[in-house]
Design a protein with these regions (language model features):
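N-terminal accessory segment detector
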Residues: 1-133, 147-358, 362, 372-398, ...
Length: 417
């Protein structure tokens, strides 16, 4: 079997695998973003968006990989899909019982099901099971494996850890009439750039990127496809999955609620980015990896800001550069080739509002963690601590002052008191 893998492309600061950009995010962001999207279910039909966005992306990626490598044998194609799912930290399943007509899939572990239960606990009886991404992955991969049309497979979830089941399982069936789905935006509208070491910090951005991008951060058979690293459960997730689900939600809210819908989407998605920063960046800055590699470079609290921004530059989110840092008062960050703008520009074109919600919430989270909450003292990253930070008179605000999707040549974020 030829495994599906990618390479970290330093001219884009992104990991590309068979045409699809993949980025590191953890279970806190994955599950909180999904919960955020689910909060709109009374206004829009969100569940097909959560499934079909994954289906489109996986179908495109698998088709490209099979075609480029002339892989025609069905069993090898199945092994490639199983292996890539595991490698990315999504979990572990077997397609042994899946045919061109569908079949049942039993998963030994599933990131979304396991991660949701870990973060939020069990779901209520009237709530659906949570592995929407996996349902889309299975449908798209099966279509590609058997040379079926995109939208011809349906996948439902039969059991889930969040329902107190002891395993996770799914069932694939063929649609009588194929759904009309869209093509993946793939890399989108990209920008080339070069990462440099700033001259106002002892933090070695290039060295950190080199070290982190060469670390074996991957799911394995022994870990059942779960990546436990930096104090969180990591995934190498499709950036287009975050973007397609988020922006489709945004557009649906705009259609149903007008400008109020846009404002609601902005608030929800920015908060998801802030929660991501609190848990992901906070977990990283308390991890053994941070203490061994990055903390020795940090002489001041400003170096901590540079340290976590250097880490972001290894996560595939594009190029993050600090333009201005006023201790405990202000942070200005420029993002080049940000995955949010890349995807939005390719699929939707120009926007009437700034759309880089993850970066917006993430930059705000950095300042709140380091200057408001003082992550250097190793606090417990609890919900209570998060509320304390958010309600503090020292809490930071953020605005996106430039946006590529609005016609600017870069994305700029200003965090301020």
């Amino acid at each position: 079997m030829k495994p599906l893998r990618g390479n970290f492309d330093t001219q884009y600061n992104t990991y590309i695998a068979a045409g699809e950009p993949l980025i590191f995010h953890c279970h806190h962001y994955n599950t909180f973003l999904q919960a955020t999207l689910e909060d709109t279910k009374d206004y829009i039909d969100i569940y097909p968006i959560l499934i079909e966005s994954a289906q489109e992306i996986v179908y495109a990626q698998m088709n490209q990989f099979f075609s480029e490598n002339q892989i025609a044998e069905i069993e090898e194609r199945k092994q490639i899909a199983e292996d890539f799912f595991m490698f990315c930290g999504y979990g572990k399943f077997s397609l042994e019982n899946v045919s061109v007509d569908g079949g049942k899939v039993v998963s030994e572990s599933d990131h979304y099901s396991y991660g949701w239960k870990s973060k939020f606990g069990l779901r209520a009886e009237n709530e659906p099971m949570v592995s929407f991404f996996t349902r889309g992955f299975l449908a798209g991969a099966t279509e590609a494996i058997f040379n079926l049309a995109l939208g011809s497979m349906e996948c439902k979830q039969l059991s889930c850890y969040t329902k107190n089941d002891s395993f996770v399982s799914f069932e694939l069936t063929k649609n009588i009439n194929s759904k009309k789905l869209s093509n993946s935006p793939k890399q989108g509208t990209t920008q080339n750039h070069t990462l440099n070491n700033p001259n106002n910090t002892s933090v070695n951005y290039l060295g950190i990127r080199e070290a982190l991008t060469n670390m074996p951060i991957e799911g394995t058979p022994s870990s059942k496809g779960i990546i436990d690293a930096f104090g969180v459960l990591l995934t190498r997730m499709y950036s287009n999955y975050y973007c397609q689900t988020s922006y489709r939600m945004l557009k649906k809210l705009e259609e149903t609620m007008g400008s109020d819908g846009l404002m609601l989407a902005d608030q929800l998605l920015t908060e998801a980015g802030h929660v991501c920063a609190f848990n992901t960046f906070g977990g990283i800055m308390q991890s053994a990896e941070w203490n061994g590699l990055i903390k020795p470079m940090c002489q001041t609290r400003e170096d901590w800001v540079h340290g976590i921004v250097a880490v972001v530059n290894a996560f595939g989110w594009g190029f993050w550069e600090i333009l201005e840092l006023e201790p405990a008062k202000k942070l200005v960050v420029k993002v080049t080739n940000g995955y949010e703008a890349n995807s939005y520009l390719q699929t939707l074109g120009k926007s009437s509002i700034p759309i880089s919600f993850l970066a917006k919430g993430g930059t705000k989270g950095i300042m709140n963690l380091i200057y408001n909450g003082d992550i250097t003292t190793q606090p417990s990253l609890t919900d209570e601590y998060y509320s304390e930070i958010c309600n503090s008179p020292k809490a930071f605000s953020v605005r996106q002052t430039k946006c590529r999707a609005m016609g600017d040549d870069q994305d700029i974020f200003e965090v301020y008191l």
